[in-house]
Swiss-Prot record:
Its EC number is 4.2.3.87, 4.2.3.93. Mg(2+) 3 binds at D444. It holds the Pfam family Terpene_synth_C. A motif (DDXXD motif) lies at residues 299-303. Keywords: Lyase, Magnesium, Metal-binding. Sesquiterpene synthase involved in the biosynthesis of delta-guaiene (53.7%) and alpha-guaiene (44.6%), two structures composed of five- and seven-membered rings. Also produces 1.7% of alpha-humulene. Mg(2+) 1 binds at D299, D303. GO terms for molecular function: magnesium ion binding; sesquiterpene synthase activity. It comes from Aquilaria crassna. Gene3D superfamilies: Farnesyl Diphosphate Synthase, Terpene synthase, N-terminal domain. This is Delta-guaiene synthase 2. Mg(2+) 2 binds at D299, D303. Its cofactor is Mg(2+). The gene is C3.
Amino acid sequence: MSSAKLGSASEDVSRRDANYHPTVWGDFFLTHSSNFLENNDSILEKHEELKQEVRNLLVVETSDLPSKIQLTDEIIRLGVGYHFETEIKAQLEKLHDHQLHLNFDLLTTSVWFRLLRGHGFSIPSDVFKRFKNTKGEFETEDARTLWCLYEATHLRVDGEDILEEAIQFSRKRLEALLPKLSFPLSECVRDALHIPYHRNVQRLAARQYIPQYDAEQTKIESLSLFAKIDFNMLQALHQSELREASRWWKEFDFPSKLPYARDRIAEGYYWMMGAHFEPKFSLSRKFLNRIVGITSLIDDTYDVYGTLEEVTLFTEAVERWDIEAVKDIPKYMQVIYIGMLGIFEDFKDNLINARGKDYCIDYAIEVFKEIVRSYQREAEYFHTGYVPSYDEYMENSIISGGYKMFIILMLIGRGEFELKETLDWASTIPEMVKASSLIARYIDDLQTYKAEEERGETVSAVRCYMREFGVSEEQACKKMREMIEIEWKRLNKTTLEADEISSSVVIPSLNFTRVLEVMYDKGDGYSDSQGVTKDRIAALLRHAIEI
């Protein structure tokens, strides 16, 4: 606890301090820019030429279906599938024939199954039955086949016992074989055992796979070169977006005005880029990056620094959504409030009204108000000593985790669909959004509850579960990990059942969940971004791929 002075905050109030480290980037992204495309029209020409070559490879008719399946998968894993969405969809529709697999080996069946399920095609898991021996066991010691099988099992849904058996079998065999493998297969297996492709941030997975594919003897030179050039071109765009966000962050001077809060504008951009990296969503990323930044400041204010009286005043001001309300909140909070209103005004002017869908701003503001209300409830838990039931805690946490808000704002930002009906549906927290939100909450709480307890908080999913069901801390944590798997199966199931309306929510739900899996895989990688998070951001946003 510390007694702090900040703006007009009460001087005698005892306040908590989370001791968040300063930004690990300094002003690097404020000034850094790629020179990859500078005065180099030949790169753009080469990129276009290679893109056409890859397209031709993808669409050419062939009777060699295993090779076509492998090529389609490689294009997607290398991060260039967004160039060929129409062609890939057409190929997958041709491959969606349940009888095709009868001629495939286990490796090809695994890739085929993962590709089709990953794109919403319903494929029964019993396609793997014919690969079991008379004892009902899988039989293969081929590492590449085991890797492909292991990756496929992560698209399982509840009740698929054969995939439960397959994941145990393939993981055990791969762990035993890994020390004997050589690059690049060794790295493919190591990456999969750490974070399977289906649960990985797709941009990060591409960054990992590009050098692995480049080292394969069977690589297609034009595809390998195209993936490298495309990565560097996209990186230049992403750097320019982060540079713009860094300028906005610095202009408001949030780090010095709010020293108790996390200074994480680069980490926030990494979060939003992980959710949708494609060039056509540039404006959406810019808006959502600012939303992550301002939401993080509000979260830290409610969670760490503000008194109950102060945060209640801020909540009331958010409900009013009026610049005149700024005079009714503590001075140190005013920069947050002004920044918040400015973000949504820019969003309305530059993204929503430009598309003639001005009704979207009401959804955006309401979902933001909703998350502030959830922060208010959590502040009341701490300041009043109230201990909610497990269900009550989880109901609020589905909102405070932010994923409902981010999914809805991403839908608005992408603007690809008949939005009003989709937004109405997503606002009800359907199974797809709920599963994504619950995974986020379980992962977050497992990695943060001990640090939060050190600063006086006693309410978390772990502690609420322990208290309500009379189990040990170890048992509660085990239950949370089991629930993550259950919710992943539910999320997989909802993507397979998606209709015209819900299909637009599939990608946001999956991608935001993937970002959480990666951000928190070795701890709270957002609050403490000095280790693996920094390395991943550097790989995606600092270091170009050598060509």
